Amino acid sequence: TDTGEYIDPLQFYTDRIKDTTAPRATHVILYPQAGKGVVAGSSQKKIVPLNAPGTPVEVWGKIAAGIKAYDYMDGTSNNYGVRSVKLFVDSMNVFSSKVDGFLPDENRMINAWTDYEEYATKSSWFMRSQILPGNTWRMLEANEEGGVVTIDEERPYIFRYELEDLYGNRRSY
């Protein structure tokens, strides 16, 4: 583009490329906020596989989440980034991202949106559902706490992710 923005070229070929495959997730990650939250009795982040649905994780205090997910298309084994991610807690939208382009000088913001430590050490790509302090990337929106959720009652909290691609193929977890 004239501004140097990288854009998703797929939006120009939707009439020529078929896609009926919804994005898929494999794991979520829970981030207790330093000094303010715990996950499974620990102050360390915890990765939870999604192949064990309904398995509760005990958390308390201020918690953020993230998801490991990819988009796929018909007729290929390639994986792609997920265009739209929304996190709902008890049916309230606490975070959303819609990635359809970015400027070269926004790379630092992308690294802050992802769990860069997981990527650098394990080549594992988690998208945070939290806006870290200083991250002003225009593709992210969150609640007043930047996507952080306060768990302060002994009751089930229902976290639900909604993933969607350019074609409107959607899957929830």
Model-derived features with residue positions:
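Conserved, short, structured surface segments that act as functional micro-motifs
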Residues: 1-24
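Short hydrophobic alpha-helix segments
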Residues: 10, 29, 97-98
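Long, low-complexity serine/threonine/glycine- and acidic-rich segments characteristic of extracellular
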Residues: 33-173
